[in-house]
Amino acid sequence: MVNLIPSPEAVMQILKRTGAYREGHFVYPSGKHTPHYFQMPLAFRYYDTARVLAVALSRKFRVDRDISSQLPKVAVISPSSGGIPVGFGVREALNAEQIYWAEKEEGKRRFRQYVNQGEINPCIIVDDIIRSGGAIEETVGLLKELGAPLIGCGAIVRFNSAPDRIGDVPIKSLVEFESPMYDNSDDCKDCEDGVPEEHVRF
């Protein structure tokens, strides 16, 4: 029988093979330094890889009876553009009825689609990577304004520094990743060792 939920080690091998996971000396837009960097769109540029990852994450939701009992009357929500390919893959695998995505405009996160109160089914928030959980929390705020209940949340990779639940909803992930983060160059070991910096964006 095919294992539809690959191990975290197998997922990391996929991310390394596709170039979505790299090691080095990286500086985030926030100014923080780290020896690890995920660029998830590189994994989702390949259909076969994207499908493996999306189906694997969808299985995490399908085995949850509280979620599976509400399918297909469910909405998959992507809190940012990076989560859109994951969202479409998970929606297809779950045969969920709706999909929405949010974007940040003028400093405020809002849904790309025009949505009225009461139009959204019970929601599963899906992203490619959760580093701090800020985008997830902002999206939950949007859902509350629209009266849409949150029944699930997940990502391909969740940093251990991010929350592991939103309210009483646990955050599911294929990989839980721990990485040192340095607020500035004074605290960074790679800076101390003279390792060249690479400035990256999300």
Name each model feature, range by range.
Residues 59, 88, 92, 141, ...:
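Short, well-ordered alpha-helices that flank and scaffold nucleotide-derived cofactor binding pockets
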Residues 1-67, 202:
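Active-site-facing substrate-recognition patch
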Residues 81-124, 132-137:
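Short, glycine/charge-rich flexible loops or terminal/linker lids adjacent to PRPP-binding catalytic cores
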Residues 2-13, 140-202:
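PRPP-dependent phosphoribosyltransferase catalytic core
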Residues 66-68, 112-118, 185:
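Short amphipathic alpha-helix with an adjacent loop that forms part of the alpha/beta core around
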